Amino acid sequence: MIIADNIKQLHSIRNSLIKQQKIGFVPTMGALHNGHISLIKKAKSENDVVIVSIFVNPTQFNNPNDYQTYPNQLQQDIQILESLDVDVLFNPSEKDIYPDGNLLRIEPKLEIANILEGKSRPGHFSGMLTVVLKLLQITKPNNLYLGEKDYQQVMLIKQLVKDFFINTKIIVCPTQRQPSGLPLSSRNKNLTSTDIEIANKIYEILRQDDFSNLEELTNKINSAGAKLQYIQKLNNRIFLAFYIGKVRLIDNFLKETGPSC
C-alpha cells in the first residue's frame, strides 16, 4: 500500500500509477471498523484502484470536545488497510486541506440540511460538504462509497455532486450493525461496558416498537439510561440521535424493518 501524506504526493501517484484505471474512493475519519471495511471491500470489487482517506475534519465539529476526543488509531488503521490490499491511503494534514484557513465554505440551503443533524449540529453539514468537495477534487474518483448510516450526509453529497458537475458516481452501502442492532460507528470505541449495556437495551426497545407513539418511545429510551436528542419520522424512515454518557450516537432505518442486522 502506498501512503500519501500530502496532496502533491497523491497527485504524483495518481498521475504516474493509476492513469486510465477506474478509481474507487472511500473517505473516512479513521478509527476504522467493519462498516468501513464493508465499503472498502465493495470498492475493491468494483474498481481497479481503491483510495481510502483518513482525515478528521475540524470544520464539521460544532463541539470542540467531540473533535478532541474523536478516536485516533492511525497505526492500527494502516494495518487494517494493508490487510485489505488497499492501493493508496491519503492521510493529509489540516494544513494540506486548509492551506489558507477555512476561507471558503459550502453553505447548503436544502431543507434536509436544516433539520435533524443540521439543526442539532450547526455548521456540521457546511464543514462536511466543504471537505468532501476538496477530497473529490483531489482524488477525482470514478466511484464514491458512502454508508447509509449518515443518511442526511449522503443526500447532501448527492446534491453536491450534481450541482458542481462532478463526474463521480455515488454508491450507498447498507448500515452495518452489531447483533443488538446498534450501528457500527467510530464513536462506539468511546463507550464503556456499562454504556454498551445501555445501548443494547435501547436497541431492544427499538426492535420491539412500531413507532406509532414517539413520545412514549422517547420516555422508554430515556428511562433506559440514554438522553434522546431527537427522534423523528421522515418519509418512511426513523431518524434518531441520543447520548449515552458523553458519547453521541445517530441512526436511521426504514420504519418497516426497524434497526435489523
From Swiss-Prot:
Pathway participation: Cofactor biosynthesis; (R)-pantothenate biosynthesis; (R)-pantothenate from (R)-pantoate and beta-alanine: step 1/1
Annotated SUPFAM superfamilies: Nucleotidylyl transferase
Top class in the EC scheme: ligase
EC number(s) reported in the record: 6.3.2.1
GO biological process per UniProt: pantothenate biosynthetic process
Protein residues bound to ATP: 29-36, 147-150, 184-187
Keyword 4Fe-4S belongs to the record: no
Reactions the enzyme catalyzes: (R)-pantoate + beta-alanine + ATP = (R)-pantothenate + AMP + diphosphate + H(+)
Keywords for this protein: ATP-binding, Cytoplasm, Ligase, Nucleotide-binding, Pantothenate biosynthesis
Any further remark recorded for this protein: The reaction proceeds by a bi uni uni bi ping pong mechanism.
Subunit: Homodimer.
Function: Catalyzes the condensation of pantoate with beta-alanine in an ATP-dependent reaction via a pantoyl-adenylate intermediate.
Protein name per its UniProtKB record: Pantothenate synthetase
Biological source species: Francisella tularensis subsp. novicida (strain U112)
